[in-house]
Amino acid sequence: MAVRQVVLDTETTGIDWKQGHRVIEIGAVELIDRRVTGAYYQQYLNPQRSSDPEALRIHGLTDEFLQDQPGFAEVADAFLEFLGDAELIIHNAPFDLGFLNHELQLAGKAPLRQAVMDTLADARRRHPGQKNDLDSLCRRYSVENRHRELHGALLDTRILAEVY
């Protein structure tokens, strides 16, 4: 039986959803038996607030670009349909899941309940005392990432799928 997994990443307006920060991009890439299938989900979102300057420096998604994008509630069903019951593979899962579950709550939806593999926690177990951010893992495992000048959720999921 084929095993379906989804590599998932978000970009956000800041680092803490409890301070009102929101998701501004979702990227997800499908794996079947640990191989990229080509199926993906990407959505930019209007957070109805500005990004913190540090977050903007990381992702480069401006208010002007995001203002015409849908809100999370408008795309929640399509996002959940793409995920299905697949295991989620996320680098620093508590961060992304905190934001996504908050967005789902605001949209009147149940939180994500899929199995989750946190690749950051896994990397810390495998490489204690070393840097384990995505760029460091790319260098360690010889995964090409020179085209990654800014963080983008879909780009980061594609890179993480290669690392995984």
Language-model regions, residue ranges each:
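Conserved non-catalytic scaffold segment of RNase H-like nuclease domains
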Residues: M1-Q114, R124-P128, N132, S136-L150
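Acidic, divalent-metal-coordinating active-site segment for phosphoryl/phosphodiester hydrolysis
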Residues: G152-Y164
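Short, conserved phosphate-binding/catalytic loop or strand-edge motifs used
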Residues: M117-L120
